[in-house]
UniProtKB/Swiss-Prot annotation:
ATP binds at residues 149-156. The gene is Nlrp9a. It comes from Mus musculus. This is NACHT, LRR and PYD domains-containing protein 9A. Residues 1-94 form the Pyrin domain. LRR repeats lie at residues 695-716, 724-745, 752-772, 781-802, 809-829. Residues 143-465 form the NACHT domain. The lineage of its organism: Eukaryota, Metazoa, Chordata, Craniata, Vertebrata. Keywords: ATP-binding, Cytoplasm, Immunity, Inflammatory response, Innate immunity, Leucine-rich repeat, Nucleotide-binding, Repeat. Belongs to the NLRP family. GO terms for cellular component: cytoplasm.
Length: 949
């Protein structure tokens, strides 16, 4: 039986006579070819009924059925049906638009907080609005647009305005026939749903069927917001589905839509906050971005004038502008409303205006207390506490359950009476949303949820609400969840200043206990084995500390850490980092990564609003960066011994400031890693000069274009008797054999250097021969030489062999990824068997030798008593060759402890042989990439950063 989805098409086929219907089917045999689709078999449609044919059309040609039918009506001379169908469809589309217009006009008028008059709002969003129009006007193909920006910056409001304007025929009329707006967090409690059911839930009566609507998906736009509040994760999936009729877990439906598996021809307009941006972006195909940048200075002035009367508004605007940190907060529309509301309440009570401060915890508390006093100023604190606690319980229960829309049962269950609800609505703590209730802004739900723990610290059993320790676990263990945004408020409210505001109104506040619990948790976090090298994104901890700023508390927290990895991804991160690290006296090892985009934000107007940074004094730190204070902050940490800036682009000026800080007597850094910092040969000279009298013993400059000129400067440093450098890492530095000439002299005069890494440079045999001349000199004390990927051949093995037989200092030699071949390996084996050879670690991985060398290598294993580690990875030898090696490994004279081999590349028989050797020889480990971890650590290379770089 025909379901309702195909009824619209069927009613028109019913108007065809039998003879017309037969001709219709005959033309249908060729019609799909016009759409580049496969035709339905004639045997399936020859005798089919009209009802069955509709089902087949929707099944075989989803999204194209109506286009085909309208074309076929013309071919059977029923232009009247084609015209009638198109007219009726337009009428139904018009009715849908009218329905959406009325719906969103109500939402816009009653439930949307624009904070400014409509005319001014249009000016506020002019740039973003024009960008939205341009994107869809220029692109005929499906487009995915992401609206991003700070919390409370107006993203959701912008999308509601776009929906209202489309329904009012003022936006994208020629592009989209249907636009659907969904807040995805409303799907949190739905287990399974089809996209068809989701769309149907928004349609008024007498609408087109879902099949008809989706018959032209390129004319459909989905507007989706609320991703920050989803209970479930959306991630790259393989179990996606293209059937929009099929009932599926809601996360599969959303992922399939976002990843363009379901309805790939439709367009998407998404609101993504900070909590969801990094998770959702990887799912999208070539997304375009529109950024909501907040209020301009002019908009703030308009807002103040419209919020107060004209003269008062002008005065308040001037006062706000004179307090730069506070004025910068006003750029966020929601915070601007809070600040002005607070001032208005204080004016009405003729109170002295509060000093707002610059922390969010303090700002929200001043706002809440001012609002509360406007109604309950004379009530006893015990009564006030009981009343506000009901609102806090509603908020925190919602957070734990991930519920953001409440009904009357939710309010009653948490003790909120009808009279209290009216007060909360009047205070703008809550607002109506249809027949339900939501917090006036999502951040207010976070605030009252956190306030719950200050009003009721002692554990009370609740089936849903977790205690403070559990809350901290949710914030830091799971990171991106519904608690993501509360972490700053929790720290910001745990201050004596906030305590002094709350206690007169609500009685005793548990600020001290909350601080102690935070310290206990951070202590446990810093001591966990898995966090031995704690990776800190400033937003996760430093911003929280910055919102507290109580010196004793901050130092108690930062005193817990001895090693940190800090990833700085924007200017705000840069402003928070030095404040916190300056209060971390025990940090010994610091991995610091400043993403390239940070410097673009500072210097390039296209990547950031420089005026905004200046107004908010956010640039003070970045300006100080140029004066060297950034490095002073880090390098003057009393216990700091290890500093890693891998991946941070440093200009010559920045390098100069860094080196100036290194020269201070208070700097005790012994390991300095500057890999991939875009350091030039000129900057290398600056570094070399600064290290002559420093305490730096380990220097990594890998992946920098130092060239031969830069190495020449380093060699001058090495020749200075005051230089105490022991390790120098120079892989991927664009060096040639000429650099080896400079190093020759340095190796003969430096007594401290024990490790030299020259991997992946174009040294060739000529360069290595020069190094060998130095190594044969008894004055050369080098212990490790890394030469992987240096374009060596078997020709240089003669000189290397001579070194092995006369130099007893050299213990490690890495020759991997060179074209040494059988001839070279055999020559090296002769030297390794020499009684004077004391080699301990030898790398021959990827050296293009065969099983012909295995007999020679086997002899080395039983002859060279000092050899402990041998890397033979990625070489082509067969089972017979492996047998010879294993026989030697089982020999009592073999002292090898590490053998580099990828066991998975060998046959099952060979793997069994290796396993037997490992079982017999308990001291031996057969490993793939046996030295990779050590090499990356010494070079300071970070493989993965949590960044958008």
């Amino acid at each position: 039986m025909m379901d309702s989805s195909g009824y619209g098409l069927l009613q028109y086929l019913q108007k065809l006579s039998d003879e017309e219907f037969q001709r219709f089917k005959e033309h249908l045999r060729k019609e799909p070819e016009k759409f580049k689709l496969k035709p339905i078999s004639w045997t399936k449609i020859k005798n089919t009924s009209k009802e069955d044919l509709v089902m087949q059309l929707y099944t075989h040609y989803p999204g194209k059925a109506w286009d085909m039918v309208l074309s076929l009506f013309l071919q059977v001379n029923r232009e009247d049906l084609s015209t009638m169908a198109q007219t009726e469809r337009r009428d139904k589309q018009t009715k849908y638009k009218e329905f959406m217009k009325n719906t969103f006009q109500h939402i816009w008028t009653m439930e949307t907080n624009t904070y400014i008059p409509d005319r001014s709002y249009h000016e506020f969003i002019e740039v973003q609005y024009r960008a939205l129009q341009d994107i869809f006007d220029c692109e005929s193909e499906p487009v995915t647009v992401v609206v991003s920006g700070s919390r409370g910056g107006g993203k959701t409001t912008f999308l509601r305005k776009a929906m209202l304007d489309w329904a009012s025929r003022n936006l994208l009329q020629n592009r989209f026939q249907y636009v659907f707006h969904f807040s995805v967090f409303s799907l949190n409690n739905i287990t399974e749903l089809s996209l068809a059911e989701l769309i149907s839930s928004t349609l008024p009566e007498s609408s087109e069927t879902v099949d008809d609507i989706l018959s032209d998906p390129k004319r459909i736009l989905f507007i989706l917001d609320g991703f920050d509040y989803l209970k479930f994760d959306l991630e790259l999936r393989t179990n996606l589905c293209n059937d929009w009729r099929k009932k599926l877990p809601i996360q599969i439906v959303l992922s399939s839509l976002l990843q363009k598996i379901m309805l790939p021809e439709c367009s998407l307009l998404l609101e993504l906050g900070n909590a969801s941006l990094s998770n959702i972006i990887p799912l999208l195909q070539y997304p375009r971005e529109i950024i909501m940048s907040g209020f301009s200075e002019q908009t703030i002035e308009i807002y103040c004038v419209s919020f107060f009367n004209t003269q008062t508004g002008v005065e308040i605007f001037k006062n706000l502008k004179s307090i730069k940190p506070l004025f910068n907060l006003c750029r966020c529309p929601h915070l601007c409303w809070m600040i002005c509301s607070t001032i208005k309440w204080q004016y009405e009570r003729r109170e002295v205006a509060s000093r707002f401060g610059r922390t969010l915890g303090l700002l929200y508390t001043i706002f809440m207390v001012s609002a509360f006093k406007s109604t309950y100023a004379r009530n006893p604190s015990k009564q006030n506490r009981a009343r506000i606690r009901t609102l806090c319980t509603l908020a925190v229960e919602g957070m734990w359950k991930q519920v953001y829309v409440f009904d009357s049962d939710d309010l009653r269950r948490n003790g909120i009476s009808e009279s209290d609800k009216k007060v909360w609505l009047r205070m703008k703590f809550l607002q109506n949303q249809g027949s339900n209730i939501v917090f006036y802004h999502s951040t207010l739900q976070w605030y009252f949820a956190v306030l719950f723990y200050f009003l009721q610290y002692k554990d009370t059993r609740h089936p849903v609400i977790g205690n403070l320790a559990q809350l901290l676990g949710e914030i830091y263990a799971h990171k991106q969840n519904q608690w993501f945004h509360t972490r700053i408020l929790l720290f910001g409210m745990a201050t004596e200043q906030v305590n002094s505001l709350l206690e007169p109104c609500f009685g005793c506040i548990s600020s001290k206990e909350v601080r102690q619990e935070i310290i206990r948790y951070i202590k446990s976090l810093s001591q966990q084995e898995c966090n031995e090298k704690l990776v800190v994104h400033p937003q996760n901890l430093f911003f929280c500390i910055l919102d507290n700023q109580e010196e004793r508390f901050v130092r108690q927290l930062m005193d817990r850490f001895e090693e940190m990895t800090v990833d700085i991804s924007d200017v705000d991160d840069m402003s928070a980092t030095p404040y916190c690290l300056h209060r971390a006296p025990k940090v010994k090892n610091l991995h610091l990564h400043i993403q390239k985009r940070v410097f673009l934000e500072i210097h390039d107007p296209e990547y950031g609003d420089l005026e905004l940074f200046k107004l908010g004094q956010k640039c003070s730190f970045t300006t100080n960066f140029g004066d060297g204070l950034l490095f002073c902050t880090f390098l003057h940490l009393p216990h700091l011994k290890y500093m890693n800036l891998y991946g941070t682009n440093l200009s010559n000026d920045a390098v100069e400031r860094l080196c100036s800080a290194l020269k201070f007597s208070t700097c005790g850094v012994e390991e300095l890693l500057l890999g991939k910092c875009d350091i030039s040969s000129e900057a290398c000279g600056i570094i070399a000069a600064s290290l002559i009298n420093s305490e730096v013993k380990h220097l990594s400059l890998v992946e920098n274009p130092l060239k031969n000129k830069g190495v020449m400067s380093l060699c001058e440093m090495l020749k200075d008797p005051s230089c105490v450098l022991e390790s120098l890492m120079l892989s991927y530095c664009c060096l040639t054999f000429i650099a080896c000439g400079h190093l020759y002299e340095a190796l003969l005069s430096n007594e401290h250097l024990s490790l030299l890494d020259l991997g992946s440079n174009f040294l060739e045999d000529t360069g290595v021969n020069l190094l060998c001349e130095a190594l044969k000199d008894p004055n050369c004390t080098l212990k490790e030489l890394w030469l992987p990927g240096c374009y060596l051949t078997s020709e240089c093995c003669e000189e290397i062999s001579a070194v092995l037989t006369c130099n007893t200092n050299l213990k490690t030699l890495k020759l991997g990824n060179n074209n040494i071949q059988d001839t070279g390996v055999k020559r090296l084996c002769e030297a390794l068997c020499h009684p004077n050879c004391e080699m301990q670690c030898l790398g021959l991985d990827m050296c293009d030798f065969t099983s012909d060398c295995c007999e020679d290598l086997a002899l080395v294993l039983t002859t060279c008593n000092t050899l402990k580690s041998l890397n033979l990875d990625w070489n082509a030898f067969d089972h017979s060759g492996l047998e010879m090696l294993c026989k030697a490994l089982n020999h009592k004279a073999c002292n090898l402890e590490v053998l580099g081999l990828d066991k998975s590349l060998f046959s099952e028989e060979s793997q069994t042989l290796l396993q037997a050797v490992e079982k017999k020889n308990k001291n031996l480990k057969v490993l793939h990439f046996p030295w990779l971890k050590e090499e990356l650590e010494k070079r300071g290379v970070r493989l993965v950063w949590n960044s958008k770089n």
